[in-house]
Amino acid sequence: MSARISLNVGREKSLLRKHPWIFSKAVNKIKGNPMLGDTVDVFDSKGNWLAKGAYSPESQIRIRVWSFDEHEEIDRDFFFAKLQSAQARRDWFISQGKLTGYRLIAGESDGLPGVTIDKYDNFIVCQLLSAGADFHRYTIVNCLTELYPGCHIYERSDVDVRKKEGLEPVTGWLTEPQDSTECIIEEHGIKIHVDIATGHKTGFYLDQRDSRLAAGKFAKDKTVLNCFSYTSTFALHCAANNAKEVINVDVSQDALDMGERNLALNGLSDANVSFVKEDVFKLLRRYREEKRTFDMIILDPPKFVESKAQLTGACRGYKDINMIAMQLLNPGGLLLTFSCSGLMEASLFQKVVADAALDAKRKAYFVERLQQAADHPISSNYPEGYYLKGLVCQVE
């Protein structure tokens, strides 16, 4: 019999809206002795059953809900059905975009809290970020081996958030070890090298797929500065769409080297594509002093804000970098700017960019909005799943 969790008065409201998180301060009583990752039943203060979820005694998110169906068992059939339905929801755009790399499970948004699963050609990468996800690791792997026979499964549970769950980092093969962790994926006709062991996140930024396509659409005959370029995949779309020049900037030489490999992989000329190992903030200031200008600038920085306490400082950082970028744009030039922080709401991000335009003494028109690709869905009961915001600004 599972442990029983009773909530404080009034703390059931979010669960009635099917939100999957229960915070520690909502918990009143615990009947039983649940261990890390155990499935528990949750009741309101009057004893009405609400949900069943995974217990995490060290996390502020004390319980992550698996199901709002009292009769549903959290077993192999449960995980198999979740994986099947997630794949079915993605089939249409996988076929449309001719994708061989995509996110299969986006955690809470796909009904599996703390579970991230990405498919890269014949590799599957699991990132298990919660106590419940960690507890059911081998059940999930067993389901994946049946659904995707012949695929090789690798774990990248090396994210700091696991510490908040009382979990150690875990990486390595979950199926038979392979000689290489590299593969090639394809999106919208562009081929990309991915290393699932050493690449960022689970190997690559799948969430920016639609934004890369948009960048290519705008790039024809333009001089493009691609900042925080990582493996230069924005540049691939720009070069493939006849950009006049593309400069990729990143602090990682390994990432830039992979960018050069990606360029060659797609048979694109390196005559008008260059790679600069430099701190973006310093380089932008130097270009401003040198009075360099561009027709299009892409700003895709790492996350500036991890907590609410950092939000004010993050806004200053976003404003500063967007201001300098606007000062480097030719009249009528385009700025593609992004924030990947869930705490940075879309309205606040737009205000920060508008403030940057004022400080730059430029006028900006927001001509298009961008967000995470469709394999990173935003479910109606989990608005926190909306984290990646992008703006296309025409700057005069």
Curated annotation (Swiss-Prot):
One Gene Ontology term of the molecular function aspect: rRNA (cytosine) methyltransferase activity
Catalysis: reaction(s): cytidine(1962) in 23S rRNA + S-adenosyl-L-methionine = 5-methylcytidine(1962) in 23S rRNA + S-adenosyl-L-homocysteine + H(+)
SMART domains linked: PUA
UniProt keyword Transport present: no
Identification of the protein by name: Ribosomal RNA large subunit methyltransferase I
This protein's GO CC annotations: cytoplasm
Location in the cell: Cytoplasm
Listed CDD domains: AdoMet_MTases (cd02440), PUA_RlmI (cd21153), RlmI_M_like (cd11572)
Ranges for domain PUA: 2-79
Keywords: Cytoplasm, Methyltransferase, RNA-binding, rRNA processing, S-adenosyl-L-methionine, Transferase
EC number: 2.1.1.191
Gene it is expressed from: rlmI
Organismal lineage: Bacteria, Pseudomonadati, Pseudomonadota, Gammaproteobacteria, Alteromonadales
